Each structure stands twice: as C-alpha cells, then as structure tokens.
C-alpha cells in the first residue's frame, strides 16, 4: 500500500510540475487549450483532419494560438492577416524550418527543403540562380514542357478511350520535366527504372499524408523505436537517392566545366570551386539530397494537382465546356498551347487558380520556425519555436472567396470576365520559404491541362453527381480519391 501511495504521489507531483512549467511559459506565448502532461494537446486534434481542428481552435482562441505536441509548444497562425504578417511582413524572423522529425531523420539537415540557417540560404540561392541559368521562366523550359505535353498526349492515346487510372501517366509528365532539368534526359513511360521511381514517389506522398506520420511528428521517439510506414518512407527515399547518386557519378566522369548541361553539372562546378574550403556547404552528400528534394517536390505536387484537376473537370462538365471553348477559340487545333496564350484565356487561368485554391494541396504548409526571440502581436515567441501556418484558412477565406467550399472559377474573375488576382492565393506558401518551383509548376499546370483538353474529351465512368472529390488523406497533403476516366480523342 505504501508503494502504491508513493507512486501516486510521485505521479501527481510530475503532473503538477509539468502543468506549472507549461503554464509559466504560456504567459509569453499566445493562448491555447490547456495541454495534458507529456502528451500535450494531441487528443484534442483530429489527426485525420487537422485543418478542421485548427479552425475550431481559432474560433475560441483567435488567429494566433498555441498547441503543445508532446511537451513542445507550437504556435498556429490562422487566417490571411496573421499568415501574411508573419511570412511576408516579418519574413526574415519566420524563415527558419520548423520541426518535421520524419524528414529530418532522412535528410540530416541537408538539401533545400529541410535544411536550416546559412546552409539553407546558400543552397536555396544557388538553386534559384541555377534554375534561372537553365531557362526557368524562359522559352527554354517552356519548350521542354511543351515537348513533354506532346508525349503525354501520345501516351493517353494508347489508352484507346478505355477507362484508366490516370495516376501514373500524370506523374510521368512533370517527373520527366524535372529529370531534364536535373540530369538532362527524360524517360520513356515504360522504362522500368522510371516505373520504380514513380511508384516510390507516389507511395511516399500517401505515407507523408497518413495519420501515422502526423503522430510521429508529435512523438519523434516513435521513429526510432516503433515499426511503421515511416520505415518504408525512408527506404523509398534512399532508393531514389541511390539512383540519383549513379547519375551524379556519371556526371563527374563526363563533366565539362566550360559547358554545364544541367543542375548536377552546375553544382559539381561549384563543388570544385569550393573544394579548398573545409566549411563549404557544397558537398556531394548535400548535392544528392538537394536533387532528391527537387525530384520529389517537382513531381508529386504537380502530378497530384493535375490528377485533382481532371477529377474536378469530370465533376463539373459545365466548367470543362467553358475551358474547351476558350482553348478552341484562342489556340485552335493546329498548334500547341503556349504561355503567351494564357493572358488571352482568362477563364482557363481562373480555372487553374481555382483548382489550386479548392484542393488546398498542403493544408498546413511545411512547418516554419522563428530565427530569434520575437514579439508578435504582443506575444513573445522564443527562438526556435515551431510555427504552423494554416494555408487552408487563407485559401478558404469566405470574405475573399464567397462559398469557398464550392469549386467555382468565378472566384478569380471580375464582373467583366477578366482574370482577377488575389493576395489570398497562397498554395505555394509565401515569404522566404516560398516554393522555389512555383513558376515551373504553374507553367506545367497550364500547358499540360490545355494540351489534354485540346486533344481529348474527358468521359467519366460515373455520373457527375456521383463523383466524390473529398480527399482520401488530409494530413501533410490533400490527395484525391481513386477514380477512372476515359480520354476520348477529338
């Protein structure tokens, strides 16, 4: 009995100590629900729909509030004003990468997505400069995307108008574009290496968006001591990285420093230039992780958006008809669509923006962190605190986008039918950590979709009213449900 009493007393003291430590720090941090000892607010969150949970909390605590994932505080920013104030008005202070334990374990603070501090700044600056040198935003890259769009059309013709799952084919096109940028060549859609890479990328997107991965983010100790899909994620990343390491080795053997061919060549030249510097960030290991980041980010986000776009076109045949009418009128049948067409196609442009707004691909963004102690809206946020910015709350703001849960390209059209920009359009995030490939992704979305609709009528195997567009995952990413469709040649 004495032992039981001692255990109860000890546990009570630990709980009181935990509550005191958290409440003493909460005087400086924004308000939020009272966390439980050790586990924090985890049981107050719906890990299958974190966005919904954050919206509920914001109604109680306002647009800036604190949640505890385990024993660590995380500040949540909800709504356009709070997100803009942090990421744009205080961009430098909110530019650090926040905690993402599953990725940190794999990337080891290297690459462009999950690195920190000066290392991240140097690699990002180099990446943006190199992408510009390779023609990003210029005709060179546009030519590559147009060529891949033509290959995509030929591959879709091979389906002979039969029902098919578009996942793999729609993944191949953006993947080939990023491959041409990284190591200068594309794959045939039947190439076995390509099939394997695409399978790994697709599986990883599902794993990252699963409740288990969200749970591992709250309790990182699970990554080391519990089996789970995070081990499959790591194996898939290492498989992709090993393939890219072979490409790097081939480039080392054929490198001509006077004539760089692609991203790997530019990096190897920089690596050689800094070989004398023992503190250089430009190591071969960092190269392998950076190109893996580019490979994954440049493929899955665009392919998922394309897949969702076709599903929404099937669901809304009246929208499809308007887009196809505009394509017929502006582009016609005898040439490929080009980026110059977009300014004369306001409805199609509005449609592409509405797809990205509506699907809300990365609902809570990648986590940020503050680079220093900062006073934000009369709260003191300590250096290193993880920041979650709810992009959903911006993209689905009912004041900016009336009836935000309805898919309507009119959200981006003015009263005269002209395209209307919105500061609330943040699918690529904002500020210092904004997606480096935004321009490429928007180009691919426009050219791939217009080329598909120029050449095919989309036919659903279900009646439009029976098509479900609800995402099957809503964690890291919102992924569309499985569906099939027919590509009927025009």
From Swiss-Prot:
It is an enzyme of class 1 (oxidoreductase). It catalyses: an organic molecule + reduced [NADPH--hemoprotein reductase] + O2 = an alcohol + oxidized [NADPH--hemoprotein reductase] + H2O + H(+). It comes from the Eukaryota. It is a peripheral membrane protein. Heme binds at residue 435. Its cofactor is heme. InterPro entries: Cyt_P450, Cyt_P450_CS, Cyt_P450_E_grp-I, Cyt_P450_sf, Cytochrome_P450_fam2. The modification N6-acetyllysine is found at residues 249, 375. It is found in: Endoplasmic reticulum membrane; Microsome membrane. Its main location: endoplasmic reticulum. Keywords: Acetylation, Endoplasmic reticulum, Heme, Iron, Membrane, Metal-binding, Microsome, Monooxygenase, Oxidoreductase. GO terms for biological process: arachidonate metabolic process; long-chain fatty acid metabolic process; monoterpenoid metabolic process; organic acid metabolic process; response to nutrient levels; response to xenobiotic stimulus; steroid metabolic process; xenobiotic catabolic process. GO terms for molecular function: arachidonate 14,15-epoxygenase activity; enzyme binding; heme binding; iron ion binding; long-chain fatty acid omega-1 hydroxylase activity; monooxygenase activity; oxidoreductase activity; oxidoreductase activity, acting on paired donors, with incorporation or reduction of molecular oxygen, reduced flavin or flavoprotein as one donor, and incorporation of one atom of oxygen. Its EC number is 1.14.14.1. Induction: P450 can be induced to high levels in liver and other tissues by various foreign compounds, including drugs, pesticides, and carcinogens. PROSITE patterns: CYTOCHROME_P450. Cytochromes P450 are a group of heme-thiolate monooxygenases. In liver microsomes, this enzyme is involved in an NADPH-dependent electron transport pathway. It oxidizes a variety of structurally unrelated compounds, including steroids, fatty acids, and xenobiotics. Belongs to the cytochrome P450 family. This is Cytochrome P450 2C6. It comes from Rattus norvegicus (Rat). The gene is Cyp2c6.
């Amino acid at each position: 009995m004495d032992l039981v009493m001692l255990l109860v007393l000890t546990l009570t003291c630990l709980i009181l100590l935990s509550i005191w430590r958290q409440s003493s720090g909460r005087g400086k941090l924004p308000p939020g629900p009272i966390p439980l000892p050790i586990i924090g607010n985890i049981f107050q969150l719906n890990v299958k729909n974190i966005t919904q949970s954050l919206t509920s909390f914001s109604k109680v605590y306002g647009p800036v509030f604190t949640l505890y994932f385990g024993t660590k505080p995380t500040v949540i920013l909800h709504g356009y004003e709070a997100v803009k104030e942090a990421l744009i008005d205080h961009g430098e202070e909110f530019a650090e990468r926040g905690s993402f334990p599953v990725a940190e374990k794999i990337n080891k603070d290297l690459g462009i997505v999950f690195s920190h501090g000066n290392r991240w700044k140097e690699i990002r600056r180099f990446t943006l400069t190199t992408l510009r040198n390779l023609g990003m935003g210029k005709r060179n890259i546009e030519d590559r995307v147009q060529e891949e769009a033509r290959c995509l059309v030929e591959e879709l013709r091979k389906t002979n108008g039969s029902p098919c799952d578009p996942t793999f084919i729609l993944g191949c096109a953006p993947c080939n574009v990023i491959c041409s940028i990284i190591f200068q060549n594309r794959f045939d859609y039947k190439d076995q290496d390509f099939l394997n890479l695409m399978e790994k990328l697709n599986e990883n997107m599902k794993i990252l968006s699963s409740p288990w991965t969200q749970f591992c983010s709250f309790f990182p100790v699970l990554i080391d001591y519990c089996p789970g899909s995070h081990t499959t994620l790591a194996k898939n990343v290492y498989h992709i990285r090993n393939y890219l390491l072979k490409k790097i080795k081939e480039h080392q053997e054929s490198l001509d420093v006077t004539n760089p061919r692609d991203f790997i060549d530019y990096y190897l030249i920089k690596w050689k230039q800094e070989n004398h510097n023992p503190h250089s960030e430009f190591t071969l290991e960092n190269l392998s992780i950076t190109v893996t980041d580019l490979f994954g980010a440049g493929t899955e986000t665009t392919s998922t958006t394309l897949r969702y776009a076709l599903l929404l076109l099937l669901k809304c045949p009246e929208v499809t008809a308007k887009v196809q009418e505009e394509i017929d009128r502006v582009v016609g049948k005898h040439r490929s669509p080009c980026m110059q067409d977009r300014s004369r196609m306001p409805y199609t442009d509005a449609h592409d923006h509405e797809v990205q707004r509506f699907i809300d691909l990365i609902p809570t963004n990648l986590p940020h962190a503050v680079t220093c102690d900062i006073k934000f809206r009369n709260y003191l946020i300590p250096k290193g605190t993880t920041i979650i910015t709810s992009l959903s709350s911006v993209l689905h703001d009912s004041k900016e986008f009336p009836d935000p849960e309805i898919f309507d390209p009119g959200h981006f059209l003015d009263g005269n039918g002209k395209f209307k920009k919105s500061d609330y359009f943040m699918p690529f995030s904002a500020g210092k950590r904004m997606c480096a490939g935004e321009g490429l992704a928007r180009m691919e979305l426009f050219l791939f979709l217009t080329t598909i609709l120029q050449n095919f009528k989309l036919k659903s195997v279900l009646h439009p009213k029976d098509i479900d567009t609800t995402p099957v995952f809503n964690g890291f990413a919102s992924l569309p449900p499985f569906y099939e469709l027919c590509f009927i040649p025009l």
